[in-house]
Amino acid sequence: RAANRVVGNVAQGLGVDSACLEVAYGGLTLEALQPAVIAVTGADALVEVLTAQGRRYAVNTYAPLALDAGDRLSVNTPQAGSRNYVAVRGGWSVAPVLGSASTDTLARVGPAALAAGDALQVGSAAGLPPVALAEQAAFAMPRADEEICLDVVLGPRTDWFDQQSLELLCSQAWAVTPQSNRVGIRLQGD
């Protein structure tokens, strides 16, 4: 929601729930095909712009950024946190499935997952309020070398775990593996 607030996606039915691109663990590069105002929020990651003229510079997260046609935006691997969110003024034009623009790869529900080379349409920014000057992160993201304690909330697949498995889950340290995605986090135990 912060990314949408920064770019002014709060009027004419766009709301702060306009679709954002969710970037897990960095590695995203976008090229603007037309002038656009975007914002990147979330994890503490180096975000850079390579202009169409070849100039490279770092940009702040939680702030509006004007891109010209041909500019490339890169979101690198986060130093803290794991996910970034990219909003565009006017919103990403994506047809919702069951009221959501999210892709659930496990359930195979939602719009098709993005792939390299995809072109995304941008909605109209007509009538939107001015962009925000900047936002602040809601909290400090944990760094990759920090150990954090999480609450366990059992969900609809509780029957997949016996009592011994639940006790093991709560009694040791776990590391997040690269096989994680927006549907779930794969853990490696001791």
Label each PLM-derived region with a short phrase.
Residues 1-190:
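Conserved "landmark" site that anchors the functional core of diverse proteins
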